[in-house]
Amino acid sequence: MNGIRDVVKEEQPRERLLLEGAGSLSNRELLAVLLRTGSKDETVLKLSDKILHHFDGLRMLKDATLEELVSIHGVGVAKASQLIAAFELGRRMVRLEYQNRYSIRSPEDCARYMMEEMRFLQQEHFVCLYLNTKNQVIHRQTIFIGSLNSSIVHPREVFKEAFRRAAASIICLHNHPSGDPAPSREDIEVTKRLVECGRIIGIEVLDHIIIGDHKFVSLKEKGHI
């Protein structure tokens, strides 16, 4: 016997990870490492397959709720909590790269900063990035969750945080859960209202970015700002 090398089999993804590295594992094997054990009826890899099939792959799984996970036979609160915590850590690690006073020089910079966090959201989220005079992000805040319209997104809520943070300018973003970032009439109306308020109080609204699935639209580039 040669120790750990002799126990590397298909049903032992953790041992494969130790010997070959995490990059060599499939999605089902990585999920099995997080789950640690299967149930009395199935192996951990079979449980991984069932979870991935239930959510049609990683895209939907990463946003799974506790209730959705525990509805799967073999997944209890402990396993569900482990998965939710792992996915949240992954999201935070993606953000970490950009959080150290990330500078925004173009709509592409802004979309890159928020794309992975916003493109899979199941509801519309209206988010503001608050910038200093060097166009560095000093704060961001979700202002509203739900269908965007001018009666709900109130300038008071947008600019209140700008004053608190002594922001020089603002970039607004929201996502389209459909994946299509084409602006609606309401999107344009909200944008024009915020831009006008910004002019009056001296805090410029630089852009309004609509996030789709790996696509975005800048309302400034479209001529609406």
Curated annotation (Swiss-Prot):
GO molecular-function terms, A-Z: metal ion binding; metallopeptidase activity
Pfam families xrefs: RadC, UPF0758_N
SUPFAM superfamilies: RuvA domain 2-like
Residues of the MPN domain: 103-225
UniProt keyword annotations, A-Z: Hydrolase, Metal-binding, Metalloprotease, Protease, Zinc
InterPro entries given in the database record: MPN, RadC_JAB, RuvA_2-like, UPF0758, UPF0758_CS, UPF0758_N
Protein name according to UniProt: UPF0758 protein BCAH187_A4587
Record-stated family: Belongs to the UPF0758 family.
Superkingdom to which the source organism belongs: Bacteria
Transcription is among the record's keywords: no
Motif JAMM motif boundaries: 174-187
Disulfide bonding pattern of the chain: none
Annotated GO biological process: proteolysis
Gene3D superfamilies named among the record's database cross-references: Cytidine Deaminase, domain 2 (3.40.140.10)
